[in-house]
Amino acid sequence: MSELDPTESLIEYPSDFPIKVMGLAHDQFVPTIIDVVVVHDPEFHEGRIEQRPSSAGNYLSLTVTVRATSREQLDNLYRALSSHPMVKYVL
């Protein structure tokens, strides 16, 4: 049985790739996330976001679908989102 190279990606590039981003429900949350994503996917637009509020309305879950072109691009995007103060979780 062959072993997988940990540096090798299982994703075929380019491809559409969904990322879940969760944070407090705030009127600037969506525009802020768009600004972060556009740095890593310049063709990203608002139409590629699905929004779901929490049952109490305190949190907002976004699914942003980016055009992934490399593992490095996705890693950088995950780091940027995870380190943003408005973001609680990135999946």
Curated annotation (Swiss-Prot):
Belongs to the UPF0250 family. InterPro entries: UPF0250_YbeD-like, YbeD-like_sf. This is UPF0250 protein mma_3250. HAMAP family: UPF0250. It comes from Janthinobacterium sp. (strain Marseille).
